[in-house]
């Protein structure tokens, strides 16, 4: 059946994207090509990713696939490969945001902040703060480019979120306070 073939093709492409992304990350860390290839296969074939696809979390899967190469861009920039690091970071931030799973990208920002903090400490100890600030500037520009490429998508997602159940809370403050102050009031014991 044609429909089943399309599903298998999509899973193969998604798995390849996952492998390639992790391969790029391992290469940025200086791992040899064959070990990076093996690492990419092991990463892509971990069970969690294959649970996401049949569960219908395709865009979460794709967003997660673009996180390792985004980290690779950050690593490259702080290893004084400013242009390559900036391009890789901008490209994969743009692809991450295009995947439209903003929640995963938001959580990923905290990982990046941790990396930046670690690189700052390292640069401070080595007295290489000018290099740190140059790399950070390149990465900030890359982030702006990645976001600006998707500004229309982000705006429409923001507008749409106001109309969904994930928009504003339906809880009323007075109701919440009643439940907090008298949690057993409605229980029949």
Residue ranges of each PLM-predicted region?
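Short, small-residue-biased leader/transition segments that mark boundaries at the very start
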Residues: 3-8, 179-186
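Alpha-helical transmembrane segments of multi-pass integral membrane proteins
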Residues: 10-11, 59
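A generic secondary-structure micro-motif detector
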Residues: 11-12, 132
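Membrane-embedded helix bundles of polyisoprenyl
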Residues: 16-29, 33-122, 135-157
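Membrane-interfacial, low-structure loops and terminal tails that flank and connect transmembrane helices
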Residues: 125-134
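Extracytoplasmic catalytic-loop and juxtamembrane helix elements of membrane-embedded
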Residues: 157-177
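Cytosolic catalytic cores of cyclic-nucleotide second-messenger enzymes
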Residues: 189
């Amino acid at each position: 059946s044609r429909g089943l073939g399309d599903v298998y093709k999509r899973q193969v492409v998604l798995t390849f994207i996952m492998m390639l992304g992790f391969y790029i990350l391992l290469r940025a860390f200086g791992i040899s090509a064959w070990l990076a290839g093996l690492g990419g296969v092991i990463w892509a074939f971990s069970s969690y990713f294959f649970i996401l696809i049949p569960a219908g979390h395709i865009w979460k899967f794709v967003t997660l696939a673009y996180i390792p190469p985004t980290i690779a861009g950050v690593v490259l920039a702080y290893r004084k490969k400013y242009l390559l690091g900036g391009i890789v970071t901008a490209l994969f931030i743009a692809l991450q945001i295009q995947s439209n799973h903003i929640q995963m990208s938001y959580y990923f920002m905290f990982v990046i902040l941790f990396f930046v903090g670690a690189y700052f400490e390292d640069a401070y100890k080595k007295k290489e703060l000018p290099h740190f600030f140059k790399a950070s500037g390149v990465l900030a520009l890359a982030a702006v480019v990645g976001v600006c490429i998707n500004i229309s998508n982000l705006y429409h997602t923001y507008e749409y979120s106001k109309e969904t159940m994930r928009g504003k809370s339906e809880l009323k403050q007075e109701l919440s306070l009643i439940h907090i102050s008298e949690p057993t009031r409605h229980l029949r014991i």
